[in-house]
């Protein structure tokens, strides 16, 4: 599976259960820039088959992110369909990100509902974001 994605246009489709794994970062952040290749390598592993992997510069997509403002970078965000299941800063170590992505991917329906509820209503909807650094 390619880590590259196309620009998403318009409103998300109802009933879409596509996985989205995003790294929310900022172009000015040196840590984020250094993390880019490792994030792309994780995408190439196919941890969540069929998932869209996005590298998101929060300043370039501020309008789409609404009120969401991370306290630190980089942020791992994982969403399935309309449910954002995980959105938090993690140390930029591939093993940590891999374990979290695998854990989120293994959630059953009831667990996913509980995880999504803990994030609240101001969480971003990853379905409206685009990949800022393809490849």
Language-model segments: what does each one mean?
Residues 29-32, 76:
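The canonical Cys-X-X-Cys-His
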Residues 33-47:
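Typically the conserved alpha-helix immediately C-terminal to a functionally engaged Cys/Sec
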Residues 24, 43, 48-64, 70-72, ...:
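Thiol-based oxidoreductase modules, predominantly thioredoxin-like and allied folds used
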Residues 116-135:
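Charged phosphate-binding loop/patch that engages nucleotide di/tri-phosphates or the phosphate backbone
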Residues 15-29:
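Short active-site neighborhood of thiol/selenol oxidoreductases, capturing the structured segment around
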Residues 72-121:
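Non-catalytic, surface beta->alpha helical segment in thiol-disulfide oxidoreductase systems
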Residues 1-19:
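A short beta-strand-turn-helix
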Residues 64-65, 97:
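Receiver (REC) domain alpha4 helix and immediately following alpha4-beta5 loop
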